[in-house]
Swiss-Prot record:
Name of the molecule in the record: Uronate isomerase
Gene Ontology MF terms in the entry: glucuronate isomerase activity
UniProt xrefs under Pfam families: UxaC
Key word Isomerase present: yes
GO BP annotations, alphabetical order: D-galacturonate catabolic process; D-glucuronate catabolic process
Catalytic activity: D-glucuronate = D-fructuronate; aldehydo-D-galacturonate = keto-D-tagaturonate
The keyword Phosphoprotein is assigned to this record: no
Length: 465
């Protein structure tokens, strides 16, 4: 069987027919970690390592597993040596999604059809570098060539959004680049919580002395984001919790934490519950889609974390006792307060997929006739794989309506990652095609094609607008 050809990952004739209906659809990338400054400045790349390996902790993780020295991963080794080290690793990465992403990027972006190996790495390195300059490869060109219509970045609540404003005012750039409100530092276990409160007070001109004044200041920032095109929020929780507390308890807790007190686990849960509930109330009011990423155990290799910081490839998926009961209680609490916004829940540990999809199905009722009001998000991070995607879609199809799914997102720091949308579309086509081939659904290519088109693009547009 041919590898990485036009029928890559399309396992049956039905899949090939369905893929033809979605392969050229635009991309609505509603969540990523791209830098709007880089998009605005639009500098032409002259080295593949800067574009392909810089900041890519997926690749760094594999390179460490292959015995590559840190010098050749994040250190001061030459760019050519880093490229060769990755080529050496890529040869041994069969079965890992990074292999598929990489060969797709090499072929579809740079026209490199031969497989990258240690033997041809230097020649391909120089060839791609020449291609970058000759074809003026820049962030905006990569975005335009990938037919990206919308980009949702991930932004600190105190960001002035200057680069988003400049992009919005630039009539030469058609892609919408919208900020996303990401208030990780608003939670008391965060090491920069006290600093965040001080900066929040300064940014809003408010005196923050208690929980109520803290939330009022947060609302001011949410309103500012809304004024500047924000359509969504995001948050990352290690665990989903529900632990109620009285306002007076929250006031005392906040005062103590700002004085240097280390909160206890119960207090962390109480604060997380209260702050998230208030934020959801505000998100609903301002029309933000609320994204919740959960289940990551971060920065586990303390030496590497202390040297390089966060998001460098030493994170894991976690487990949680009582996920279903906490998630149900939290969502019910939001419903009772009329504070349930549109939400996308991204579960990192696939063993909880059915529980998550089943829980979300309890709370889909809404007065606005919105299909898929609560979304079970695509396979995230370590579940952003062929099996991870299938597991997520299986759970959603069995427990809800797959046809209402808002589909793929890159969640990436790389301008090359739009190939992941094509990867997803191929897997989706095979997934739906197998239903046809196995007689599980009618052989109705108009209906299944419409379903595939909706999942690939149309549902996301409708959901975020």
């Amino acid at each position: 069987m041919a590898f990485n050809d036009d029928n890559f990952m399309l396992k049956n004739e039905a899949a090939k027919r369905l893929y033809q209906q979605i392969k050229d659809q635009p991309i609505f990338d509603y969540h990523c970690h791209l830098d709007p400054k880089e998009i605005f400045e639009d500098k032409v790349y002259d080295n593949i390592v800067d574009l392909w390996l810089g900041g890519d902790h997926y690749k760094w993780r594999l390179m460490r597993a292959n015995g590559i020295s840190e010098e050749e991963i994040t250190g001061s080794a030459s760019k050519l040596d880093k490229f060769k080290a990755f080529a050496r690793t890529l040869q041994r990465s069969y079965g890992n999604p990074v292999y598929h992403w990489s060969v797709m990027e090499l072929k579809n972006v740079f026209g490199v059809c031969e497989l990258l190996t240690e033997d041809n790495a230097e020649e391909i390195y120089h060839r791609i570098n020449a291609y970058l300059v000759e074809h003026q490869i820049s962030p905006r060109k990569l975005i335009a060539d990938s037919r990206v219509r919308f980009i949702g970045t991930t932004d600190h609540p105190l960001d002035d959004l200057a680069w988003h404003k400049r992009l919005a005012a630039d009539d030469t750039f058609e892609t919408v680049v919208a900020p996303t409100f990401r208030p990780d530092e608003a939670f008391i276990e965060h090491q920069r919580f006290a600093d965040f409160v001080a900066r929040l007070a300064q940014a809003t001109g408010r005196t923050i002395t208690d929980f109520k004044s803290f939330i009022a200041a947060m609302e001011e920032r949410i309103a500012y984001f809304a004024e500047n095109g924000c359509k969504a929020s995001d948050i990352s929780f290690t665990e989903i919790v529900f632990e109620a507390a009285e306002p007076e308890q929250l006031d005392r807790l906040m005062t103590r934490v700002l004085e240097g007190y280390q909160p206890q686990p119960l207090e962390v849960k109480q604060w997380q519950t209260a702050v998230f509930a208030e934020l959801c109330r505000l998100y609903k009011h301002y029309g933000f889609v609320t994204q919740v990423h959960f289940g990551a155990l971060r920065n586990n290799h303390s030496a590497i974390f202390n040297k390089l910081g966060a998001d460098v490839g030493v994170d894991s998926l976690g487990d949680q006792t009582g996920l279903a009961i906490n998630m149900n209680r939290l969502l019910d609490h939001l419903v009772q307060r009329d504070s349930l916004p549109k939400m996308i829940w991204y579960n990192l540990n696939p063993s909880y997929n059915i529980a998550v999809a089943n829980t979300l199905a309890n709370f889909q009722a809404n007065e606005n006739g919105i299909a898929g009001y609560l979304q079970f998000g695509a396979g995230w991070w370590f579940a952003d794989t062929k099996l991870g995607m299938i597991s997520q879609m299986n759970a959603l199809a069995e427990q809800g309506l797959l046809a209402n799914f808002v589909g793929m997102l890159t969640d990436s720091r790389s301008f090359l990652s739009y190939q992941r949308h094509d990867y997803f579309r191929r897997i989706l086509s095979t997934y739906l095609g197998e239903w046809i081939e196995e007689g599980e659904v009618p052989e109705d290519y108009q209906a299944l094609g419409k379903m595939a088109q909706d999942i690939a693009y149309n549902n996301a547009i409708q959901y975020f607008n």
